[in-house]
């Protein structure tokens, strides 16, 4: 089972946020919290709040045990960018880009979750390929 929490349009650059995301990927929840508490970055505070939120989601909504949870996936995608002008010499202007980030954190209680997901994708692809081969055979059979 996977528990998810999202936070959109957070005023931090995605590039800076991804540095913190890489620190906690595939770690246990307790270990991830310790890492974030001891990391002196703006992104660490934001991700720690979101991590606590997804832990609450997992325990209250999905009846998972907090001790068994681990960070399945952490994503920091680019959100909308605010564009501002900075006046320069001779009537020109430079663009200031105030970037924002969309965060997604997924927690799982099953260490083999990723293996099951990969196997499911492989079986879907096999079925799709087999279906295409059957269509090709039926089409080629009609033309003869």
Swiss-Prot record:
Name of a matching Pfam family: Ribosomal_L22
GO cellular component: cytosolic large ribosomal subunit
Matches recorded under InterPro entries: Ribosomal_uL22, Ribosomal_uL22_bac/chlpt-type, Ribosomal_uL22_bac/org-type, Ribosomal_uL22_sf
GO biological process, one term: translation
Segments for region (Disordered): 124-144
Keywords, sorted A to Z: Ribonucleoprotein, Ribosomal protein, RNA-binding, rRNA-binding
Keyword Ribonucleoprotein listed: yes
Molecular function terms, GO-annotated: rRNA binding; structural constituent of ribosome
Biased composition (Basic residues): 124-137
PANTHER family in the cross-refs: CHLOROPLAST 50S RIBOSOMAL PROTEIN L22-RELATED, LARGE RIBOSOMAL SUBUNIT PROTEIN UL22M
Protein role: This protein binds specifically to 23S rRNA; its binding is stimulated by other ribosomal proteins, e.g. L4, L17, and L20. It is important during the early stages of 50S assembly. It makes multiple contacts with different domains of the 23S rRNA in the assembled 50S subunit and ribosome.
HAMAP family: Ribosomal_uL22_B (MF_01331_B)
The family this protein is said to belong to: Belongs to the universal ribosomal protein uL22 family.
Assembly and oligomerization: Part of the 50S ribosomal subunit.
Name of the protein in its database record: Large ribosomal subunit protein uL22
Organism (species): Mycoplasmoides gallisepticum (strain R(low / passage 15 / clone 2))
Lineage: Bacteria, Bacillati, Mycoplasmatota, Mycoplasmoidales, Mycoplasmoidaceae
């Amino acid at each position: 089972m996977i528990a998810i929490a999202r936070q959109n349009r957070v005023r931090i650059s995605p590039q800076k946020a991804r540095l913190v995301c890489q620190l906690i990927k595939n770690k246990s929840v307790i270990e991830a919290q310790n890492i974030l508490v001891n990391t002196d970055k703006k992104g660490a505070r934001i991700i720690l709040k979101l991590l606590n939120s997804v832990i609450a989601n997992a325990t209250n909504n999905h009846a998972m045990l907090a001790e068994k949870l681990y960070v399945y996936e952490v994503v920091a995608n680019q959100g909308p960018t605010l564009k501002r002008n900075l006046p320069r010499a001779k009537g020109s202007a430079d663009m200031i880009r105030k970037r924002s980030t969309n965060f997604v954190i997924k927690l799982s209680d099953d260490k083999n979750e990723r293996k099951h997901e990969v196997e499911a994708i492989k079986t879907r692809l096999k079925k799709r390929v087999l279906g295409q081969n059957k269509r090709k055979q039926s089409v080629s059979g009609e033309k003869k």
